[in-house]
A protein has these predicted regions:
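Charge-rich, well-structured scaffold segments of protease-associated domains
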Residues: 1-120, 138, 156, 187-317
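His/Glu-based metal-binding/catalytic segments typifying zinc-dependent metallopeptidases
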Residues: 33, 50, 120-177, 286
């Protein structure tokens, strides 16, 4: 019950004053420095977002694009944001553990029921226009080695293609026997590390490929090697065995993931945000339904230069 009380108190009567704002401002600024300025490659995601998105707010990192954005936030702006969104009628509560449904409802009504609803404005975000040409950016930083970042526009979280994209990235880089690891790291020895993953964004997201080439391999050579493997996804159908392997891995990961109470609560809340919490039970089936033909068709539509954003992150010698 303490958790219900703490969260309801925060929602109802959060204390806004200049002193507390300044304390939290400094905390966030230090977090920005630690994650984005002082950490090697820390600003790469910021640079790639700005490159890939021209109109959608995804181009803005949640923490802010630069320290000035944090430093210049006023008390009135913070209060206005809070009172626009933090309300019971705009919140999802997920509770897991040794507690009954009836007790959960009782506590929710006790602590959140008296909090007045607020007028929540509809979510209206500008749509990102289709990309029509490759976008490139090169930066130099004090980092150990060069790195390449590539981002391709992909579907939103609710689109059926989302599951296809997730399977594609698993085929490319999930596990020692994946294509990138086996071919580009172990056999050709072009990369010390390489990864492919999707953003999982509610709106149209990004499929990322990131890698660090070995010493002596240029970023141009690294990019060429990546494109070669992506072309294979387009021209040579994935084998049923390879696809079944990543499906089995996903299903086993979901089973282990749901052992943890916090993971279960987080996932239930997320699927309720998407529309229905019970849809979480359909996920494995949706992944299982992905076909070889869908993999190839989606790869052909996605892995083209005009849909790609490329960041060369060069180490200052």
């Amino acid at each position: 019950e303490t958790g219900f009380w703490l969260e309801s108190d925060r929602m109802l009567s959060l204390d806004f004053n200049p002193r507390s704002l300044e304390v939290q401002r400094q905390v966030v600024i230090e977090e920005f420095k630690q994650r984005n300025l002082n950490q090697p490659y820390g600003d790469a995601s910021h640079l790639l977002r700005e490159l890939a998105y021209e109109s959608h707010p995804y181009r803005w990192p949640t923490i802010g694009k630069e320290i000035a954005h944090i430093a210049q936030a006023t008390l009135e702006e913070v209060k206005d944001f809070f009172f626009r969104f933090y309300a019971p009628n705009n919140a999802i509560l997920a509770v897991t553990g040794h507690i009954s449904f009836e007790e959960t409802i009782r506590l929710a009504e006790k602590w959140f029921g008296p909090i007045p609803a607020r007028n929540i404005s509809p979510r209206q975000l500008p749509a990102e226009k289709p990309q029509t040409a490759v976008r490139r950016k090169t930066v130099e930083r004090k980092v150990p080695v060069d790195a390449i970042y590539m981002a391709f526009h992909m579907s939103n979280r609710m689109h059926p293609d989302y599951y296809v994209y997730d399977m594609i990235t698993d085929i490319l880089s999930n596990g020692r026997s994946s294509r990138f690891i086996q071919l580009l790291v172990q056999e050709q020895k072009l990369f010390t590390s390489i990864d492919a993953y999707i953003s999982g964004s509610l709106d149209e997201g990004l499929l990322h490929v990131t890698g660090k080439p070995v010493e002596g391999v240029s970023l141009e050579q690294a990019e060429e090697a990546i494109w070669k493997e992506l072309e294979k996804m387009k021209t040579v159908p994935v084998s049923e065995q390879e696809l079944e392997k990543v499906k089995n891995r996903y299903e086993s990961e979901q089973i282990f993931n749901n052992i943890n109470y916090l993971n279960v609560a987080t996932n239930l809340a997320f699927f309720e945000l998407l529309g229905h919490a019970e849809d979480i039970n359909l996920e494995v089936g949706k992944y299982r339904s992905v076909t070889v033909g869908q993999i190839q068709d989606t790869a052909c539509r996605t892995f083209v230069p005009e849909n790609c954003n490329i960041l060369y992150y060069k180490a200052i010698k």
